[in-house]
Amino acid sequence: MDIRKIKKLIELVEESGISELEISEGEESVRISRAAPAASFPVMQQAYAAPMMQQPAQSNAAAPATVPSMEAPAAAEISGHIVRSPMVGTFYRTPSPDAKAFIEVGQKVNVGDTLCIVEAMKMMNQIEADKSGTVKAILVESGQPVEFDEPLVVIE
């Protein structure tokens, strides 16, 4: 399924009153949900994070101390224009394992410059800058899975 077609479907869901849309073409399928159901996922993840922190606290006191300290700077760090993932997939900073990264922190980018790649269903989708500016932060590590609408890059 073409990325342009997926973007059109996302716009259709945003503009209409429907809460979820699922389309299948052959072996490929896409499910798009409105923001209300997606917002419930982080709440559930936070609910699961608390018990996970309590269990290591009994066996190892250092582990819970590092988790909150990593979350606090990330929340404070996100200011400026945020480029978000248009799909669920795997984030890559480089076009190939040996190649130089598309962007680095501090680099100036223009509208249309490739920032990264999100691989979805064996298709490499280039994520382009929708604003000119300077890369302030890259929020995801290369090879890490990303969710729909997850912040990837901050441009100032």
UniProtKB/Swiss-Prot annotation:
<comment type="function">
    <text>This protein is a component of the acetyl coenzyme A carboxylase complex; first, biotin carboxylase catalyzes the carboxylation of the carrier protein and then the transcarboxylase transfers the carboxyl group to form malonyl-CoA.</text>
</comment>
<dbReference type="InterPro" id="IPR001249">
    <property type="entry name" value="AcCoA_biotinCC"/>
</dbReference>
<keyword id="KW-0444">Lipid biosynthesis</keyword>
<keyword id="KW-0443">Lipid metabolism</keyword>
<keyword id="KW-0276">Fatty acid metabolism</keyword>
<keyword id="KW-0092">Biotin</keyword>
<protein>
    <recommendedName>
        <fullName>Biotin carboxyl carrier protein of acetyl-CoA carboxylase</fullName>
    </recommendedName>
</protein>
<feature type="modified residue" description="N6-biotinyllysine">
    <location>
        <position position="122"/>
    </location>
</feature>
<dbReference type="Pfam" id="PF00364">
    <property type="entry name" value="Biotin_lipoyl"/>
</dbReference>
<feature type="domain" description="Biotinyl-binding">
    <location>
        <begin position="73"/>
        <end position="156"/>
    </location>
</feature>
<dbReference type="GO" id="GO:0005829">
    <property type="term" value="C:cytosol"/>
</dbReference>
<comment type="pathway">
    <text>Lipid metabolism; fatty acid biosynthesis.</text>
</comment>
<dbReference type="GO" id="GO:0003989">
    <property type="term" value="F:acetyl-CoA carboxylase activity"/>
</dbReference>
<dbReference type="InterPro" id="IPR011053">
    <property type="entry name" value="Single_hybrid_motif"/>
</dbReference>
<dbReference type="GO" id="GO:2001295">
    <property type="term" value="P:malonyl-CoA biosynthetic process"/>
</dbReference>
<dbReference type="InterPro" id="IPR001882">
    <property type="entry name" value="Biotin_BS"/>
</dbReference>
<keyword id="KW-0275">Fatty acid biosynthesis</keyword>
<dbReference type="GO" id="GO:0006633">
    <property type="term" value="P:fatty acid biosynthetic process"/>
</dbReference>
<dbReference type="InterPro" id="IPR000089">
    <property type="entry name" value="Biotin_lipoyl"/>
</dbReference>
<dbReference type="InterPro" id="IPR050709">
    <property type="entry name" value="Biotin_Carboxyl_Carrier/Decarb"/>
</dbReference>
<dbReference type="GO" id="GO:0005737">
    <property type="term" value="C:cytoplasm"/>
</dbReference>
<comment type="subunit">
    <text>Homodimer.</text>
</comment>
<dbReference type="GO" id="GO:0060090">
    <property type="term" value="F:molecular adaptor activity"/>
</dbReference>
<dbReference type="GO" id="GO:0009317">
    <property type="term" value="C:acetyl-CoA carboxylase complex"/>
</dbReference>
